[in-house]
Design a protein with these regions (language model features):
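Extracellular/virion structural assembly segments
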Residues: 1-208
Length: 208
């Protein structure tokens, strides 16, 4: 008996768009409040990850079949797929061409990039997404390139250096940026009505 294993991460289907999407960044922050003074002690741990909840528009069987085949190939929480914020596939900034990581072994919430047009303003705008390696980051301040086409870019969440190596000269994706996600449940289900309209939803969390 042959056993077929899909090649993960799968490509998110585009046969229909999404009706609604919630996209969130979850952080792991511990808060301990003193019962005597009311003062808080805050500790931010390393854990931070994107989550999404998607509702597809009502669809007929032919389109629903594509979505269902995609979901079933994920095999519950086993498989992964690539997806980003479906309403923010393009940047507001002026960046063009190939942008690259400028220096290896970078960590934290700022990354040095190069390959921008020299002295160009607003190459990225606050709220733009960029993808470095397999993972997704949001730019948190407007970015201007210097005379050498370089810029330091502030991002959230922190770089995933401990999960995936970030190499010098790695290409930075800024159009249709994505991350890798995994379904939140091992159960895959869908609804249908009397005219064969399908209702399909999914919930997923970044696969770190």
């Amino acid at each position: 008996m042959a056993v077929f294993t899909p090649s993960y991460p799968l490509t998110f289907p585009t046969v229909v768009g999404v009706q609604t999407q919630r996209f969130s960044l979850v952080r792991t922050v511990a808060v301990s409040s003193s019962p005597f003074t009311g003062q808080d002690q805050i500790v931010q741990h390393e854990g931070e990850y994107w989550t999404t909840q998607i509702k597809f528009p009502p669809m007929l069987k032919n389109n629903a079949s594509v979505i269902l085949a995609f979901l079933l190939q994920l095999r519950g929480r086993r498989g992964t797929f690539s997806i980003g914020d479906q309403d923010r596939k393009t940047i507001q900034g002026t960046a063009t061409g190939t942008v690259r990581v400028n220096g290896a072994s970078q960590t934290g919430n700022q990354i040095a990039l190069d390959g921008f047009t020299a002295s160009r303003a607003n190459v990225f705008k606050a709220g733009d997404y960029i993808q470095i390696g397999s993972y997704l980051y949001m730019v948190t301040e407007d970015v201007n390139a210097n005379g050498s086409g370089e810029a330091d870019v502030k991002i959230e969440p922190s770089l995933r250096q401990g999960i995936e190596t970030i190499n010098n000269d790695a290409t930075v994706i800024y159009t249709n940026a994505k991350t890798i996600m995994r379904l939140d449940s091992n159960e895959t289900g869908w609804d249908t009505d009397q005219v064969s309209k399908y209702g399909i939803t999914l919930s997923a969390t970044e696969a770190l």
